[in-house]
Amino acid sequence: MPIYRSATTTHGRNMAGARALWRATGVKDDDFGKPIIAVVNSFTQFVPGHVHLKDMGQLVAGEIEKAGGIAKEFNTIAVDDGIAMGHGGMLYSLPSRELIADSVEYMVNAHCADAMVCISNCDKITPGMMMAAMRLNIPVIFVSGGPMEAGKTKLSDQIIKLDLVDAMIQGADPTISDEQSEQVERSACPTCGSCSGMFTANSMNCLTEALGLSQPGNGSMLATHADREELFINAGKRIVDLTKRYYEQDDESALPRNIANRAAFDNAMALDIAMGGSSNTVLHLLAAAQEGDIDFDMGDIDEMSRRVPHLCKVAPSTPKYHMEDVHRAGGVMAILGELDRAGLLNNQTRTVLGLSMQEQLAQYDIMQTEDEAVLKFFRAGPAGIRTTKAFSQDCRWDRLDDDRKEGCIRTKENAFSQEGGLAVLSGNIAVDGCIVKTAGVDEENLKFQGPAIVFESQDTAVDGILAGKVKAGEVVVIRYEGPKGGPGMQEMLYPTTYLKSMGLGKSCALLTDGRFSGGTSGLSIGHASPEAASGGVIGLVNTGDIITIDIPSRSITLDVPEAELEARRVKQDALGWKPENRQREVSFALKAYASMATSADKGAVRDKSKLEG
């Protein structure tokens, strides 16, 4: 029978000092012996996805204490990728994931907490907490802050839906008036919550449902809706039950590695491909799997991408649907239900509700359930009122979107495409693979060939695009922006956005060893591995070289003879695989990250082999 970890600090005469300090935090005599549950919050006023989380920790803590636990809250950092985008701040985004994971480990292990509730929301916070959960392997429930409502405004006598990416595109488009650009800017992000499309934050919060680590609705229920409060309340109650099941009943099925096992990771990746999620999710799932000692790699993702169809198309891949529409169509449970009926889901995985996925779908998939409370839950909709307050409205759609032929979520037979929303490409320019979000690629660009135009950094690429140096038919190559080379593997949302604003979004491709925002669409290929700084062939490309992209064949090729590539490699070996003439200040903290970072095909995690021996 496991012993409560917290007993180390709460029992025995030799722990009198620790108990004295616990008492100073409010612990009473009859509390000692109860499980100590960490409430891992990420409130900050810097990030709209987290600005409303200040009171959420205490909401959860109150429910934990009512259910018989001791709740202790702490906070992690949170970087807003949108605000950090397009300047040196983006160097810090991906490395912050490792800091978040470490900070959770430090706090939980230093204070011997027995379990956790992780309150996350945005791009690197959910993955960082997930890595910590898999590393620590103590009972955990994730509950996120929820997505933002989609923006709306009237242009040309028509109401259109908006999000952050629309503001960026219009702001860079020289044909758009200042007045219209400002109108879109003011309308794009109307409420608290994670940005309203299927960007990285919402993708990751949806994946926690498929992994079994969060409750139904976690990925899709709006941050502003009153129904979301129930997710926080139930998380506080449920974590005490999970904790007691493990420590008092020796039930290891309550542990995250047994919930989010290999089959659950397959389910999460199937969901990601089916909903056209952010390509960043590949990095984060690979990283979390490594933390849990789960054998899951790019080969598994490649295999799955070839058989899972694209069932749900959401912004930025279409302006028609945002997360509020996904929720109306039944949310993640509905997508998983369609995957299950198509024979593409392992429905015997477990969830934090103590159910098998099959049992959970029977209760929460709107195409199966007759539970009126569940059907009402998925009719929760937007209010269209600017606010930074959680649970501030209780608007509902008149009816659910259960149209599985032409609606937001579709059956396998009526899929947006039989090819999934993400694909792994490989070839001599990316021997260990690269990722493309096929959900955002037009059909005519699934095969593309063109001359390279090479940039040694995102900054010079942006300058070149805006200066008109990039021409239709070219493949923009941005290198030395990988985990080591950046360092930090910057997102390339500005280059892709500016290509669109210059009218090149459908006539150019972009290849990088960096990564892309979940807001990216178009023929944008990232995560090229090995990266340039690690001796990858992307570092050998010259402007004018022909690059051939064939998504149906899952291939990407630099059409240069091997002998010529070898001659270029000898030259780069002598130069040390560094960008030419790049002026970039790199702090000690970022250099420390770069010194241990692996390439994207390994999840850009730290190379543990450097700590061995």
Curated annotation (Swiss-Prot):
Binding residues for [2Fe-2S] cluster: C122, C195
EC number annotated for this UniProt entry: 4.2.1.9
Pathway noted in the entry: Amino-acid biosynthesis; L-isoleucine biosynthesis; L-isoleucine from 2-oxobutanoate: step 3/4; Amino-acid biosynthesis; L-valine biosynthesis; L-valine from pyruvate: step 3/4
Cofactor descriptive note: Binds 1 [2Fe-2S] cluster per subunit. This cluster acts as a Lewis acid cofactor.
Enzyme type, top EC level: lyase
InterPro entries recorded: Dihydro-acid_dehy_C, DihydroxyA_deHydtase, DiOHA_6PGluconate_deHydtase_CS, ILV_EDD_C, ILV_EDD_N, IlvD/EDD_N
Positions of modified residues (N6-carboxylysine): K124
GO CC list: cytosol
Active site as annotated: S517 (proton acceptor)
Cofactor(s) the record lists: [2Fe-2S] cluster; Mg(2+)
GO molecular function: 2 iron, 2 sulfur cluster binding; dihydroxy-acid dehydratase activity; magnesium ion binding
GO BP annotation list: isoleucine biosynthetic process; L-valine biosynthetic process
Protein name: Dihydroxy-acid dehydratase
Organism: Vibrio atlanticus (strain LGP32) (Vibrio splendidus (strain Mel32))
The gene coding this protein: ilvD
